[in-house]
Amino acid sequence: VTEAADIIQWIRPSRLFNEGRLHIGAVLGVLNGRVQIFTEDIQVKEAHQVMDFDGIISPGFVDLQVNGGGGVLLNETPTKEAIWDIAKAHRKYGTTGILPTVITDSVSVLSRAVDAAMEAVGQNGILGLHIEGPHISVERRGTHKAEFVRPLDEDTIR
């Protein structure tokens, strides 16, 4: 448990969104870049410097379907580095966790995307991989290329 005396930075936003509520007058205690204390009733002593912030602080966003970002599409560049570039592009808008998404494509592209995601997961906000297709309806495939739509088979499951 972190004590108030251990906190090295105090932040008082004008509004803070947390746990489904908008808080006014909340104070955050930050240590080593991580929020340690969140309270609405702490009296921060004059010995502590408080940074007043005129804006909203909220938890980072989690995006469960991210095909690309920063000029990179996962289907075109199924590598760990591309996944990190995609995450970096989304992070500047408040997204702290993503599921990079690969859509219906060749077995080779899907396999490389899976391998890249397995290397990247747990780093830079990569939570896993969203595989969209290829086992979908040809008639309702939308933007997915028909030549890559296929039924599920035992080889794919292995």
What is each residue range found by the language model?
Residues T2-W10, R15-S58:
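Histidine-rich, glycine-flanked metal-binding segment
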Residues F17, V30, L74-E76, R150:
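Short beta-strand-to-turn element immediately C-terminal to the catalytic PLP-Schiff-base lysine
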Residues I42, R150-R158:
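Histidine/acidic residue-rich metal-binding segments in metalloenzymes
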Residues E46-G55, A113-N124:
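Short amphipathic alpha-helices and their capping/turn segments at secondary-structure boundaries
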Residues N67-G69, W84-A113, G125-E139:
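Divalent metal-dependent hydrolysis catalytic cores, especially in the metallo-beta-lactamase
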Residues G71, E139-P151:
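Glycine-rich phosphate-binding "P-loop"
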Residues S111-V114, H144, E154-I157:
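Distinct, well-ordered alpha-helical segments
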